[in-house]
Curated annotation (Swiss-Prot):
This is Ribosomal RNA small subunit methyltransferase H. GO terms for molecular function: rRNA (cytosine-N4-)-methyltransferase activity. Keywords: Cytoplasm, Methyltransferase, rRNA processing, S-adenosyl-L-methionine, Transferase. Pfam families: Methyltransf_5 (PF01795). Its EC number is 2.1.1.199. One of its GO terms (biological process) is rRNA base methylation. The lineage of its organism: Bacteria, Bacillati, Bacillota, Clostridia, Halanaerobiales. It catalyses: cytidine(1402) in 16S rRNA + S-adenosyl-L-methionine = N(4)-methylcytidine(1402) in 16S rRNA + S-adenosyl-L-homocysteine + H(+). Specifically methylates the N4 position of cytidine in position 1402 (C1402) of 16S rRNA. It comes from Halothermothrix orenii (strain H 168 / OCM 544 / DSM 9562). Gene3D superfamilies: Putative methyltransferase TM0872, insert domain, Vaccinia Virus protein VP39. The gene is rsmH.
Length: 311
């Protein structure tokens, strides 16, 4: 099992510009790597709220970082940040960090169902209290629904063919495990295509994970909802791990950094939209060669940063 290493740690902290007595949100607590460094950058009168959908992550961090009095952990979805802040009676924060994707402990634990290399139940839920699982999707969604998921969330060239093989297979017996699904995907993709582009199941598993957890819809909704809780000058830092996430972050930041979002053919502005953000990173920040060498899972990471402005 790989040790979980926080990605783009120095870059995130540099852009977050943590200050003493500050209030910060780590919206994806994970194993607390970023959180711990934020805590160290503020004094005891500051506050870090760590949020995660995964109860195991929350319990692990509470135990590991129990010596820090400035940490509060919340088992919840980051889309509920407005309600979480209300519970803490906090009106605005100095910064927010989002580290999207699956943590190493989640990915390496076969029982979570994220890995296409290890046998385990076809689960893929970030939050185990959630009802929808990848197993349900694979065994109940129609050919059209599966194809759309694999195309939209996995950018999988063989989406329709994979969906067809899944439906034929589940007619004989339910698809319940990760390696069972991996075998079906391998059979569906032509041999010539399997020899390039990484593991043949990678895109399909990514698509199922995103669909199971509604990751992209939640991401866009959350960015739009939480920026108003940043103090002027406060920053939002988002680390993404694939192009679908990065495009959403880029597009949403751009929309929030514009004064007018009317269609270009409108003769005058009627939207009354006021810019909320200033984009700090014109291009995404990528990990350096040393980080990728020491932590191969950092290779696809992209960091984008924006700053709250006064309307």
């Amino acid at each position: 099992m790989l040790e979980h290493k926080p990605v783009l740690l120095k870059e995130s902290l540099d852009y977050l510009k943590c200050k003493e007595n500050g209030i910060y949100i780590d919206a994806t607590l994970g194993r607390g790597g970023h959180t711990e460094e934020i805590i160290k950058a503020i004094n005891d009168r500051g506050l870090v709220i760590g949020i995660d959908r995964d109860h195991e992550a929350i319990e692990s961090v509470k135990k590991r970082l129990k010596k820090y009095s400035s940490l509060r952990t919340v088992h919840d979805n980051f889309t509920n940040i407005p309600f979480i802040l209300e519970q803490f009676n906090i009106k605005a924060v100095d910064g927010m960090l989002f580290d999207l994707g699956v943590s190493s402990p989640q990915f390496d634990n076969p029982e979570r169902g994220f890995s296409y290399r290890k046998e385990g139940p076809l689960d893929m839920r970030m939050d185990k209290n959630q009802e929808l699982t990848a197993e349900y999707i694979v065994n109940n969604f129609s050919h059209e629904e599966l194809t759309n998921i694999f195309k939209e969330y996995g950018e999988e060239r063989w989406a329709s063919r994979i969906a067809n093989f899944i439906i034929k297979s589940r007619q004989h017996k339910p698809i319940k495990t990760t390696l069972q699904l991996t075998t079906i995907i391998k059979d569906a993709i032509p041999a010539s295509a399997r020899r390039k582009g990484g593991h043949p199941a990678r895109r399909t598993f990514q698509a199922l994970r995103i669909a199971t957890n509604d990751e992209l819809n939640i991401l866009k909704k959350t960015i739009n909802h939480v920026v108003k809780f940043l103090k002027p000058g406060g920053r939002i830092c988002i680390i993404s791990f694939h192009s679908l996430e990065d495009r959403i972050v880029k597009k949403t930041f751009r929309e929030l950094a514009r004064d007018c979002v009317c269609p270009p053919d409108f003769p005058e502005c009627v939207c009354d939209h006021k810019r909320k953000l200033k984009i700090i990173t014109k291009k995404p920040v990528k990990p350096g060669e040393n980080e990728v060498e020491n932590n191969p899972r950092a290779r696809s990471a992209r960091l984008r940063v924006a700053e709250r402005v006064l309307n």
